[in-house]
Design a protein with these regions (language model features):
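Conserved beta-strand segments of alpha/beta enzyme cores
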Residues: 31, 67, 119-121
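Histidine- and aromatic-rich ligand-binding microenvironments
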Residues: 5-6, 34-36, 88-89, 110, ...
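Short, well-structured N-terminal submotif of metal-dependent ribonuclease cores
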Residues: 1-34, 47-60, 129
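Amphipathic alpha-helical segments within well-ordered protein domains
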Residues: 24, 43-44, 63, 80
């Protein structure tokens, strides 16, 4: 099984939120994949909270334990199509497109993503307490 994480999941892990335990399980099982776009989103949110240097240190500790996938042109096309449909950010479109590409389960707590009608299995991390 492959698990795709979005920025919401990465941030939950970095902040030690309740869903962090589930994200950690996925990482330890070597099943976790994240788009570099979504990891970048987690980086900028962390920088807003902690500053640039500390944010880089936090996210850099996460990078080696995840498979970080850079988008290629076909994936950009899928993400652009998802974004054109409305209802989600461009960065969010990349985690959905990445999950579609890998026929993977998407782990998120983002209500905009969870509300999508797309052929991707999703796990709502907000339900974990």
């Amino acid at each position: 099984m492959t698990a795709v994480l979005d920025a919401w999941a990465a941030l939950a892990f970095l902040r030690g939120e309740p869903a962090a335990s589930r994200v950690k399980e996925l990482i330890l099982a070597e099943e976790a994949l994240i788009s570099s776009i979504n990891l970048g989103e987690a980086l900028y949110w962390t920088e807003r909270r902690l500053g640039q240097r500390q944010a880089r240190e936090e996210v850099d500790r996460l990078r080696p334990v995840l498979v970080v996938e850079d988008p290629d042109w076909p994936l950009v096309g899928v993400a652009a199509h998802l974004k054109a449909g409305g209802g989600l950010s461009y960065a969010d479109a990349f985690c959905v497109a990445t999950a579609q590409r890998h026929d993977a389960t998407l782990y998120t707590g983002d209500p905009e993503i969870l509300a999508l009608d797309v052929p991707v299995e999703m796990v709502d991390l907000r339900a974990i307490s």
